[in-house]
UniProtKB/Swiss-Prot annotation:
The lineage of its organism: Bacteria, Bacillati, Bacillota, Bacilli, Bacillales. The keyword Zinc-finger does not apply. It comes from the Bacteria. This is Heat-inducible transcription repressor HrcA. It comes from Bacillus licheniformis (strain ATCC 14580 / DSM 13 / JCM 2505 / CCUG 7422 / NBRC 12200 / NCIMB 9375 / NCTC 10341 / NRRL NRS-1264 / Gibson 46). Keywords: Repressor, Stress response, Transcription, Transcription regulation.
Amino acid sequence: MLTNRQLLILQVIVNDFIRSAQPVGSRTLSKKEDITFSSATIRNEMADLEELGFIEKTHSSSGRIPSEKGYRYYVDHLLSPGKLSKTDLNIIHSIFKEKIFELEKAVQKSAQVLSDLTNYTSIVLGPRLSENHLKQIQIVPIQPKKAVAILVTNTGHVENKTINFPAEVDLSDLEKLVNILNERLRGVPISELKDRIFKEVVIFLKSHIQNYDTILHALGATLDSSVQTDRLFFGGKINMLNQPEFHDIDRVKSLLSLIEKEQEILRLFQSTESGITIKIGKENDYEEMENCSLITATYTVGSKQIGSIAVIGPTRMDYSRVVGLLQHVSSDLSKALTSLYDG
């Protein structure tokens, strides 16, 4: 258990290092308004904090920097969400000022604004298509055995999927198929489309369309691939280049290479709990992120969690500001999407 004096010194060291990216010495601490005790006391307390593993030496300076353990203690016990400026709030609210008609635009704007306001990299995991309801479907033939299915959802999302038929399909049959699907499936959740087609719509297809079973199975396979698609939206992918920790080209190249691997990034969201979660340094799953922190917030439609927003920055990131921004963006995004889905 740290004493109040040690807590204060640790907090000031973390805050000063976040601001300056320079190791913090006892002389710097003695000039801080909040610290009123002697230089000797400061040095003794810093020595104790170092022995306990909360701060550590650097090779190039006599000052100290927070260790991962120090950051973790700071985040768990000393951190409070930063109060945002009026300008910050206006920028966030401007994303959602007008009624949102397309989910992708709201999510992509959220990612971009977060990266702009933090100067870090932001990632938004969009809701799966399965969360949407069908508004309209079109099937456009492009070759005798190939067509493109265009699904339009209630959130404005447009999904294009190629359908490969094992045999040539009559154009009039495709037209009948589209009419029946739109008549019977409008408003049905995307996740239920395949089931509804095979259990209910098949009766109508059977009586109106030749080779209906061939068409049906090809369409079913296409819908399966649509439902399972996770979508990632990025902002500020190369913002890490602005951070002094990433002036090492090899280090930043490995991180940027990881960010380009969509399946690897999706793993970062696999066990996301509701609310705000913070992973620091080696707590992250990847070696490329051992000098990074990842702060994640969830967003909802009504009470249902449907996606996540994350900010990746150096372990020296401004935790207070990022948490404050994530809380506001996730809250506003949740309200906008709830309105969009309910509408």
